[in-house]
């Protein structure tokens, strides 16, 4: 059976508070919601709203959004953010975090960039696994709304 999650960043925007968006999703029959930026929200309040409405978080975006292959990038910023995202996911009861690839760097060949990404994501997966959180990758549509993103296909 197919299961859908309402993205409360994009849906129910007539409600300013995300707690109200969770309630609206439940009213419409959703059992799951997802969101992007948990760091911008009171995750304890969202967790309480989800519980009160019989809703589960299916996923949350790993923060910060990051471009891993740019020259001089400080990967510690990503790993610190990942650890905070893991804590937020646990509070929300989300079993997974979504990793984006960030922007590609035009001055570096794609295979080398993918190698860098594989190394970073391997380290990230170890951290997440120790915390009991699953990481999933999201290839995005570079032709429509994510031009320049490194991961734009599933192969």
Language-model segments: residues:
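N-terminal pre-domain/capping segments
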Residues: 1-91, 122
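Active-site acidic/histidine proton-transfer and metal-coordination neighborhood
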Residues: 71-155
């Amino acid at each position: 059976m197919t299961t859908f999650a309402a993205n409360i960043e994009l849906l129910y925007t007539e409600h300013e508070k995300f707690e109200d968006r969770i309630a609206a999703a439940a009213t419409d029959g959703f059992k799951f919601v997802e969101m992007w930026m948990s760091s911008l929200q009171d995750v304890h309040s969202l967790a309480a709203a989800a519980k009160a409405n019989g809703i589960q978080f299916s996923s949350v975006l790993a923060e910060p959004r990051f471009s891993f292959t740019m020259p001089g990038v400080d990967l510690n910023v990503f790993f610190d953010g990942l650890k905070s995202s893991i804590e937020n996911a646990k509070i929300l009861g989300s079993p997974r975090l979504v990793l984006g690839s960030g922007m590609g760097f035009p001055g570096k060949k794609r295979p080398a960039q993918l190698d860098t990404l594989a190394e970073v994501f391997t380290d990230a997966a170890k951290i997440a696994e120790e915390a009991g959180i699953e990481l999933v990758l999201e290839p995005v549509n570079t032709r429509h709304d994510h031009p320049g993103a490194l991961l734009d296909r599933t192969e």
